[in-house]
């Protein structure tokens, strides 16, 4: 009887985590670049009541008898599918149509950040020195040349520059003050990972490379990395219909486990009453 209560308690805890994951997704339904999560369950230990036996001469075998001891959180997976692109018309809003990740970091300009973070939230307003930054002030890491060539660099727009544009190849160019040919300030760089689901959330739309993600592979937009769409941002990939379904599932699972506890408690109460 106590087994049933402990199993139900583990079910309550697991379904509470499921509801927590669902709530976080719904709360971020309009967060730029947000990636939703999914929780899976797995069973806990099982207590063996009777061992199994192999068939013998003149008789068949028998299966073991085991009683499960509840459930637990199996995994919380990051769902890295792309979100819808929302047109903003802002020159410094950039969305990725593909699998790449923007590379950002903190440093003292013009030094390139050594500790890198990754994001899909591509709203990059320039700071007072003209460097492209995130909303949190992290520098956008670019490349001095397209594709696999060049080295890492920060992307700086010259003071007074006009006609600023960001191309599908990640190139950031502008018309310098006083005229003359257009200047390419750099190329927005993108990173890919063998297992991008292993990236770890840092908050503020940033991610870190987890130990199971593999090394970053850097390039500029193009190919499987995706192209950059200027004047747009990637919205959250949260599927509200799926999240509401998960919410109902978590609620009903929580209620069912609560009923198990109530039933076991009533049985214990009946047993106590028999003793009186």
Role assignments for model-derived ranges:
Residues 1-152, 159-276:
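Amphipathic alpha-helical polymerization modules
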């Amino acid at each position: 009887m106590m087994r049933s209560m402990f199993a139900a308690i583990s079910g309550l805890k697991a379904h509470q985590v499921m509801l927590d994951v669902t709530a976080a997704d719904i709360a971020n339904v309009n967060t730029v670049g947000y990636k939703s999560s999914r929780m899976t369950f797995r069973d806990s230990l099982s207590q063996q009541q009777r061992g199994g036996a192999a068939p013998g001469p003149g008789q068949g075998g028998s299966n073991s008898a085991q009683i499960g001891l509840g459930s637990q959180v199996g995994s919380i997976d990051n769902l890295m599918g792309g979100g819808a692109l929302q047109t903003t018309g802002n020159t410094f809003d950039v969305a990725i149509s593909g699998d790449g990740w923007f590379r950002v970091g903190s440093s003292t300009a013009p030094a390139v950040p050594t500790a890198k973070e990754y994001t899909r939230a591509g709203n990059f307003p320039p700071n007072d020195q003209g460097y492209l930054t995130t909303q949190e002030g992290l520098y956008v890491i670019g490349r001095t040349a397209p594709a696999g060539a060049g080295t890492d660099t920060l992307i700086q727009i010259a003071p007074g520059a006009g006609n600023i544009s960001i191309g599908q190849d990640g190139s950031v160019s502008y018309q310098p003050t006083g005229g003359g040919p257009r200047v390419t300030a750099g190329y927005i760089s993108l990173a890919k990972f063998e297992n991008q689901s292993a990236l770890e959330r840092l908050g503020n739309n940033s991610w870190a490379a987890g130990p199971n993600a593999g090394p970053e592979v850097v390039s500029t937009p193009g190919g499987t990395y995706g192209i950059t769409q200027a004047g747009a941002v990637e919205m959250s990939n949260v599927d509200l219909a799926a999240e509401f379904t998960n919410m109902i599932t978590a609620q009903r699972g929580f209620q069912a486990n609560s009923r198990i506890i109530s039933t076991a408690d009533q049985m214990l109460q009946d047993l106590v009453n028999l003793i009186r």
